[in-house]
Amino acid sequence: MIIKPRIRGFICVTAHPAGCKANVEKQIEYVTAQGAITSGPKKVLVIGASTGYGLAARISAAFGCNADTLGVFFERAGEENKPATAGWYNSAAFEELATAKGLYANSINGDAYSDAVKQKTIETIRQDLGQVDLVVYSLAAPRRTHPKTGEVFNSTLKPIGKPLTTRGLNTDKETITDVSLEPASAEEIEGTVAVMGGEDWQMWIDALLEAGVLAEGAKTTAFTYLGEKITHDIYWNGSIGEAKKDLDKRVLTIRDTLAAHGNGDARVSVLKAVVTQASSAIPVMPLYLSLLFKVMKEKGTHEGCIEQVYGLFKDSLYNAAPIVDETGRLRADYKELQPEVQDEVSALWPTVTNENLNQLTDFVGYKKEFMHLFGFGLEGVDYDADVNPDVKIKNLVQM
């Protein structure tokens, strides 16, 4: 079939296999050009491995550290006349390219929150890798079924304490709008923490440790975002922020557990705002990112997922002098938070109108990166060609 982009709200409901492969290849080329991280991990588990920061971590591990990788994700396969999700095509491309390099690259497709997927992951590590020395936790999901109680929790993006009206960008209509959000209820906050907090990360590490498949001295990291004033009401001070604060609490227990296991370590890693399927759903983010791109590109400091994560591996995760803050978090977001960047974004924020949107912001760049997530708009791809949407992932365990 000929696959074209079909956008509904903040999501593109189609994805292009050749375009997704080109996007993965582009990220691999970047990592390869940077050179090897000699002290890096050798056997890596990435939970949430198919898109965004999780995919970038898998690429950085394989092509930056020559590591064997096992990826866990929840994606939909393609059919004869229906495209797969972008994450499916990304993972198929990654596996093909990593295998061609002589690396182990297997995947498990299923609900990472479930005990069954944890058990299958443990079996696979035991059988194929023996042990893993790095666990990257990069899940973003709208809901979670608790594996012990069966209770279903939903995650929400809402302010806390009072209603919020803020500027936003309607990406469909390309207009500046006011976005009003009611505050989250106690139940919604609890649900968001249950989905996006640190409990599942802790469950993964406990299960891997108990099964004996975590190498001595193993490291683990989960990703977070702090941001600055513009995003604080909806993000850090909102329902999602409560979940991220839960990560900060739970990492202390995980760190102690791993420290006792051959001097291992656990860190929350703070990454910059980027265009991902998750971030495009956050009301202020498209406008904030469009402004941030403009300012950071002018300063020559713009970075996407792969630049951020490769930098995190090289400068912090596998560096004797990591970039850490006073709470012990690893920081890769410092270029975004430079006062001159934030001051400029804050000054431009209230002045953007429908008329000057493309002059004051890099909305064009935002749209381009958004389309790239789904494999569209990449150079060298023939989008008028007939392609088979049913791409197989060879080394896949389907749960």
Swiss-Prot record:
Substrate binds at Y225. NAD(+) binds at residues 48-53, 74-75, 111-112, 139-140, 244, 274-276. Pathway: Lipid metabolism; fatty acid biosynthesis. It catalyses: a 2,3-saturated acyl-[ACP] + NAD(+) = a (2E)-enoyl-[ACP] + NADH + H(+). GO terms for biological process: fatty acid biosynthetic process. Keywords: Fatty acid biosynthesis, Fatty acid metabolism, Lipid biosynthesis, Lipid metabolism, NAD, Oxidoreductase. Its EC number is 1.3.1.9. InterPro entries: Eno_Rdtase_FAD-bd_dom, Enoyl-CoA_Rdtase_cat_dom, FabV-like_NADH_b, Trans-2-enoyl-CoA_reductase. GO terms for molecular function: enoyl-[acyl-carrier-protein] reductase (NADH) activity; NAD binding; trans-2-enoyl-CoA reductase (NADH) activity. It comes from the Bacteria. The record marks E75 as: Plays an important role in discriminating NADH against NADPH. The active site is at Y235 (proton donor). The keyword Kinase does not apply. The keyword Aminoacyl-tRNA synthetase does not apply. It holds the Pfam family Eno-Rase_NADH_b. HAMAP family: FabV_reductase. Monomer. NCBIfam families: EnoyACPredFabV (NF043048), PRK13656.1 (NF010177). Involved in the final reduction of the elongation cycle of fatty acid synthesis (FAS II). Catalyzes the reduction of a carbon-carbon double bond in an enoyl moiety that is covalently linked to an acyl carrier protein (ACP). Belongs to the TER reductase family. This is Enoyl-[acyl-carrier-protein] reductase [NADH]. The gene is fabV.
